[in-house]
Amino acid sequence: MRKMFICLHNTYSAKQVEEFGRIAYGFDINTIVVTKATASAAQSGIPTLHKMAYKLGKNVLFFEELDDAIEVLRPEKVFLIGNKSICDEKVDFNEVGENDLVVFCGASTGFTKLELEKGLGRYIVENEIGALGNLAIFLYEMSKKI
């Protein structure tokens, strides 16, 4: 699971960035990707995440857009984790591999249709629990595979 890229996309909250990092690094993810961060997420969330990563010997990659992350990282698959109203299929944790990019949307509105075309839209639970809840469940389920 260490090589998997975990991404927080479209966030404006510094606290969300910090908590996302705490959860991902807590599950021993080596590299967190952040795309389309604005407002306090970009101004104070990213620097806080960099500090956390440095102290833990982990990595942070920050891109302006999701397309940039896909271009640079060249993942085998891109999973966009959203809610059931926009994603048709439930996540099959067995289909997620080490060289995949797994993207969680920080905005309460979820992914746009254009963003969903960039990968495989999947949901984890029936109800909307947000990026942090989805991340925690996802990483817990993935950790059971090891």
Curated annotation (Swiss-Prot):
Protein name: Putative type II restriction enzyme MjaORF1200P
Protein family per UniProt: To A.pernix APE2001.
EC numbers for this chain: 3.1.21.4
GO biological process: one example: DNA restriction-modification system
Keywords: DNA-binding, Endonuclease, Hydrolase, Nuclease, Restriction system
Keyword Hydrolase: yes
Functional description taken from the UniProt entry: A putative type II restriction enzyme, its methylase would be M.MjaORF1200P (AC Q58600).
Pfam family, one: DUF2122
Single Gene Ontology MF annotation: endonuclease activity
Reaction(s) catalysed (UniProt annotation): Endonucleolytic cleavage of DNA to give specific double-stranded fragments with terminal 5'-phosphates
